[in-house]
Amino acid sequence: MSDIKKVVLAYSGGLDTSVILKWLQVTYNCEVVTFTADLGQGEELEPARAKAKLMGVPDHHIYIDDLREEFVRDFVFPMMRANARYEGDYLLGTSIARPLISKRLIEIARETGADAVAHGATGKGNDQVRFELSAYALEPGIKVIAPWREWDLTSRTALIAWAEAHQIPVPKDKRGESPFSTDANLLHTSSEGKVLEDPWQETPDYVYSRTVNPEDAPDTPEYITIDFEKGDGVALNGEAMSPATLLAALNDLGRKHGIGRLDLVENRFVGMKSRGMYETPGGEIYARAHRGIESITLDRGAAHLKDELMPKYAELIYNGFWFSPEREMLQAAIDHSQARVNGTVRLKLYKGSASVVGRKSPDSLYSERHVTFEDDAGAYDQKDAAGFIKLNALRLRLLAQQGR
């Protein structure tokens, strides 16, 4: 271990990474550089600086970076162009944040001359894979330290005992227990552990922190509009906004109306199933709006092909392959499809739902003249359908004739 002189730690200031900070100092006898990413998690981050200083990290080795705009612009929005949902439901709020954190970890390692980077992901979860695949893709020779795979602290009980033995404060929630395992950023908040580990038990309402209970949401619906240019949201209710500002505003609306709650049992990349509770208020509104604008601007063939590619694209992000050539290849195709995804979507927000109720676009492929039930003035000859059906039925008739 003597070859490790300096480590950059992805540091939240919470219990796990505070224990890791002390453990790195004790075990590796090395300098530790802390990096705390502001991804819009809604927490005051200066306490992380104070705690790092208290544990012996000098000011010039404490990095707290505001990455909110980069996060939404370069990671969330490209993913949303693909309509990505892992296993049909999960909007990938944790998964999509990991490559950006890894990217900045590697940048800081280069800036400070560090020998290694470290993270607080456990050996059971997906995050260890996401952090490390991204790190190796960006810096093939980097050393990655994953304490949960090295030390003998095999449970949260053991972790808390170690923390108390080394005078590291252990936070308590309002119920007098150690907190749930949570992750938060501008896109979502996730909770795992304790009562959530039983997939039969309904999530207690006190676990939810980002949305009101839909039953308690306003009794009057609220209507909003989102403007899109080339597949990306650019304005809310006619007011131009940056990517992060737009998502934050949608989060406020989603919170108010109880939108974006998801109770999910998912298949982890490492092989086990896990149960998590996700709150993605603004992301759910945005995702539905993006689908809405695509519905009138994308050709059927392109739209259906995108839907076929989406599960693979979502799986690549979930599994940690953001920086892989296959993800970049799919992204190029997806981005090409968005060239004319322009226009405005109107949504109705009401008691947990975000419904598209209107859409318009200068690039609309919707032709009211062709689709009308009234006189179409010769736009469409219904007799043409007979030949279309006959040709498409040919193979079915031949199969039937052979008794197949």
Curated annotation (Swiss-Prot):
Region annotated Disordered, chain positions: 173-200
Major localisation: cytoplasm
Source taxon at top rank: Bacteria
One GO MF term attached to the UniProt entry: argininosuccinate synthase activity
Keyword Ligase attached: yes
Listed Polar residues bias regions: 179-192
Binding site for L-citrulline: 90, 95, 126, 130, 181, 190, 266, 278
EC number(s) per entry: 6.3.4.5
Residues binding L-aspartate, per UniProt: 122, 126-127
Gene Ontology BP, a term: argininosuccinate metabolic process
Alphabetically ordered keywords of this record: Amino-acid biosynthesis, Arginine biosynthesis, ATP-binding, Cytoplasm, Ligase, Nucleotide-binding
Family of this protein: Belongs to the argininosuccinate synthase family. Type 1 subfamily.
Subunit structure: Homotetramer.
Designated name of the protein: Argininosuccinate synthase
Gene giving rise to this polypeptide: argG
